[in-house]
């Protein structure tokens, strides 16, 4: 008997077959650099920076930017942002810089140039006869890179959210050490003409390079990061959510994973903690691997680890966290089962803490406290008194153990308790639910049961 096959009859003929479903066609690619070569792109011929500045600024004012020219200018302008490396900087075996070295964003990557000239059109508008200053270059670089952040804001965002952000970014780049170089609302108007620029590989690469540089190097123009910060841990929402979850419930990653009672977690946990990746290394290429083109399909995205992502946000919903209530459910990753486990884990970690005295007036008081705690433990071990089983949770030191939670779930037949459902309905019904969000899912699934 083949365990994978089913047997049935069609027109009195016995049929035996193995039902198969579509599997994920994509290969997840890990970002580790194996060849000791810095991330690389190829651009057109390096421009005259003064000419390039005037061209790009005039095109921006006319909302007619050429992405190739913009990328060529951004790469050439890196020379204006020299800084000192505070420590030896290595990643995946590549020496980026040594302590005390003078470096620019260009030191982090390799930019190859061809002999192809850019367009460098002048479209009129703000004619500049003199050569631009460094603050003017910095302002233009900041505004151009902000197009990346604006194009990453999803269409679901409500009201004037994007316009407000664009206006705030403009204010940053017209305040010292930057200078005002465009009229009000230019950034938003330009963005509408460049709404998909976050998908242009070279533009994305340069945004990630600038961000990686300014996140480590103290610099007068570090505020340029306002437009590039979204490249850090891009397409890593699964891993980022897991990290936040760990901090929230005050456990180590190892301790937390012991509570993940579902077979579908196995593959995702293996995927998320693949050896050889610099997930925990500060200032690694890992942080910007998506924008630097080191992986075509992230193994750390919410879709790649959907069961983990769903569980974490159901626990977050139970705890009343707005971020979790607003997050988008990964519909293909057992949301009903994850909501059950999320209810039990939410109950386990919500409103409970492990508290103990840690600070004392002097050493004598510390020693007295430790001695008293030892005596208390000895008394507890000697006491064989029983308690009412309903009160077991309050007396047992093991209430927060994975075994205790697992037993509770099994005893309840793998279903949520009434108290869990009431809590889920309470937090989700008081929230303006976005389409496909966890709040909407909980409302639709459990409101009739409460």
UniProtKB/Swiss-Prot annotation:
Top-rank lineage group of the source organism: Viruses
This protein's record includes keyword ATP-binding: no
Modified residues (Phosphoserine): 389
Keyword field contains Ribonucleoprotein: yes
Signal peptide from the UniProt entry: none
One Gene Ontology molecular-function label: RNA binding
InterPro entries listed in its UniProt record: Rhabdo_ncapsid, Rhabdovirus_ncapsid_C, Rhabdovirus_ncapsid_N, Rhabdovirus_nucleoprotein-like
Family: Belongs to the lyssavirus nucleocapsid protein family.
Function: Encapsidates the genome in a ratio of one protein N per nine ribonucleotides, protecting it from nucleases. If expressed without protein P it binds non-specifically RNA and therefore can bind it's own mRNA. Interaction with protein P abolishes any non-specific RNA binding, and prevents phosphorylation. The soluble N-P complex encapsidates specifically the genomic RNA, with protein N protecting the genome like a pearl necklace. The encapsidated genomic RNA is termed the nucleocapsid (NC) and serves as template for viral transcription and replication.
Subunit structure: Homomultimerizes to form the nucleocapsid. Binds to viral genomic RNA. In nucleocapsid, binds protein P and thereby positions the polymerase on the template. Protein P acts as a chaperone on free protein N to prevent it from aggregation before encapsidating genomic RNA.
Name of the protein: Nucleoprotein
Protein source organism: Rabies virus (strain Pasteur vaccins / PV)
Lineage: Viruses, Riboviria, Orthornavirae, Negarnaviricota, Haploviricotina
């Amino acid at each position: 008997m083949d365990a994978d096959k089913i047997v049935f009859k069609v027109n009195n003929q016995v049929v035996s077959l193995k039902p198969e479903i579509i599997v994920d066609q994509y290969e997840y690619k890990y970002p580790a650099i194996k060849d000791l070569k810095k991330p690389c792109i190829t651009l057109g011929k390096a421009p005259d920076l003064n000419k390039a500045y005037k061209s790009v600024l005039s095109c921006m004012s006319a909302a007619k930017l050429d992405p190739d020219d913009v990328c060529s200018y951004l790469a050439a302008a890196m020379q204006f942002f020299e800084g000192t490396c505070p420590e030896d900087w290595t990643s995946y075996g590549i020496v980026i810089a040594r302590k005390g070295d003078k470096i620019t964003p260009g030191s982090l990557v390799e930019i190859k140039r061809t002999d192809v000239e850019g367009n460098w059109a002048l479209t009129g508008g703000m004619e500049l006869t003199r050569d631009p200053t460094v603050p003017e270059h910095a302002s233009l670089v900041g505004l151009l890179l902000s197009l990346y952040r604006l194009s990453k804001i999803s269409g679901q965002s409500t009201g004037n959210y994007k316009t407000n952000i664009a206006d705030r970014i403009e204010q940053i780049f017209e305040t010292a050490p930057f200078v005002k170089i465009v009229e009000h609302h230019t950034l938003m108007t330009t963005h509408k003409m460049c709404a998909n620029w976050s998908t242009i590989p070279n533009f994305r690469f340069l945004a990630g390079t600038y961000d990686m540089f300014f996140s480590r190097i103290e610099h007068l123009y570090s505020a340029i990061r306002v437009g590039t910060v979204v490249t850090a841990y891009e397409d890593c929402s699964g891993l980022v959510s897991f990290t936040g979850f760990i901090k929230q419930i005050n456990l180590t990653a190892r301790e937390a994973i012991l509570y993940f009672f579902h077979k579908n977690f196995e593959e995702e946990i293996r995927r998320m903690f693949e050896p050889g990746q610099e997930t925990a290394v500060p200032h690694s290429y890992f942080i910007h691997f998506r924008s630097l083109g080191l992986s075509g399909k992230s193994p750390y995205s919410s879709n790649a680890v959907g069961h983990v992502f769903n569980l974490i946000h159901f626990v977050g919903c139970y705890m009343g966290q707005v971020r979790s209530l607003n997050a988008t459910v990964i519909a293909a990753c057992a949301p009903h089962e994850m909501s059950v486990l999320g209810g039990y884990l939410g109950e386990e970690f919500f409103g409970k803490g492990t508290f103990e005295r840690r600070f004392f007036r002097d050493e004598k008081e510390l020693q007295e406290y430790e001695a008293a705690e030892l005596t208390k433990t000895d008394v507890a071990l000697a006491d064989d008194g029983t308690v009412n089983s309903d009160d077991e949770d309050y007396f047992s030191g093991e209430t927060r153990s994975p075994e205790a939670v697992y037993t509770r779930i099994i005893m309840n037949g793998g279903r949520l308790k009434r108290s869990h459902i009431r809590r889920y309905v309470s937090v989700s019904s008081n929230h303006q639910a976005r389409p496909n969000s966890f709040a909407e899912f909980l409302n639709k699934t459990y409101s009739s049961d409460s």
